[in-house]
Amino acid sequence: MSRMRVLAAMSGGVDSAVAAARAVDAGHDVTGVHLALSRSPASDRVGARGCCTLEDARDARRAADVLGIPFYVWDLAERFETEVIDEFVADYSAGRTPNPCVRCNERIKFAAVLEKALALGFDAVVTGHHARLDEDGTLRRSVDPAKDQSYVLGTLRPEQLAAARFPLGDSTKAQVREEAARRGLAVADKPDSHDICFVASGDTGAWLRERLGPRPGPVVDAETGETLGEHDGAYAFTVGQRRGLGLGRPAPDGRPRYVLEISPATSTVTVGPSSALDMRSLVAERIVWPHDGPVSCTAQVRAHGGVVPAVVTARGDELDVRLAEPVRGTAAGQAVVFYDGDRVLGGGRIRSLAA
């Protein structure tokens, strides 16, 4: 590969630091950039949770210093608020369960950052995602199935992938950490972030309550129609949720209850048995799907979930998906990504599901 001018997105974690290091090793002209995405005072606390804290910015700068590359911080907080946070709140308010990491990749890392990078004369953007990218732009799973991130990249458009580089796709997480230690990077043992980066407390329900205020309503049994209790905000629930329903009494048959449906218009949360969560078909919107005719493939509906055989048919700007096996606890708003083996075929956002 010829020498390129490369922008390395550095989150302050071990993956992005090693990805930047490998770009340097490849002979590219590398500049590091950290994205300032949050203006919450909680993100500036030492030990704050998430992935865009002041401590993360410092870790990214230290890694850039070790690598001997220029380093900058880009303030994208306003666009992140509009494109990711506002939509996250709107989705929960509408009874959907969003994946903000997917949205961030679509609208921030491979849109806002990519646009600015190309305008500044960079040839590509390097990130620490665990995924592989063929020379023809085909996205594939990482060799490390436990850390594979192709799912959160599966709705990127071909033109976005064309300017992306994922140097870690052929390495396991253990190998990445070992390499970071050999290179003297202080983030070698830094824990992975598992929280929603802009919810510093880690309590999504409480965070939404601050934004949306109380919206009380009933918790209703799907089988009997009985009102079992009250809640102060349907947005604090997700389809498939079992704990924290606040019912105070078990079902007559002793079976646990799960959230089956959220109705924002009436602020009603409907609960019932786990069997009612099984869905065998779905409709996807906001699709990336460059294929004709029905396609037999596998579908993944969770970032760390398994795949199920599926037949996908394009109908205008939506996809009709028939599943060979039921998926349980899947909600509208989640991403669905389709695979042929380890090759990503495309994806979209789930609009609706049916049994």
From Swiss-Prot:
CDD domains: MnmA_TRMU-like. Its EC number is 2.8.1.13. The gene is mnmA. One of its GO terms (cellular component) is cytoplasm. It comes from the Bacteria. Its main location: cytoplasm. Catalyzes the 2-thiolation of uridine at the wobble position (U34) of tRNA, leading to the formation of s(2)U34. Belongs to the MnmA/TRMU family. It catalyses: S-sulfanyl-L-cysteinyl-[protein] + uridine(34) in tRNA + AH2 + ATP = 2-thiouridine(34) in tRNA + L-cysteinyl-[protein] + A + AMP + diphosphate + H(+). This is tRNA-specific 2-thiouridylase MnmA. Signal peptide: none annotated. The keyword Transmembrane helix does not apply. It is found in: Cytoplasm. GO terms for molecular function: ATP binding; tRNA binding; tRNA-uridine 2-sulfurtransferase activity. One of its GO terms (biological process) is tRNA wobble position uridine thiolation. ATP binds at residues 9-16, 35, 128. The lineage of its organism: Bacteria, Bacillati, Actinomycetota, Actinomycetes, Frankiales. The record marks 129, 334 as: Interaction with tRNA. InterPro entries: MnmA-like, MnmA-like_C, MnmA-like_central, MnmA-like_central_sf, Rossmann-like_a/b/a_fold. Keywords: ATP-binding, Cytoplasm, Disulfide bond, Nucleotide-binding, RNA-binding, Transferase, tRNA processing, tRNA-binding. Gene3D superfamilies: Adenine nucleotide alpha hydrolases-like domains, HUPs, Translation factors. The active site is at 104 (nucleophile), 197 (cysteine persulfide intermediate). Disulfide bonds join 104-197.
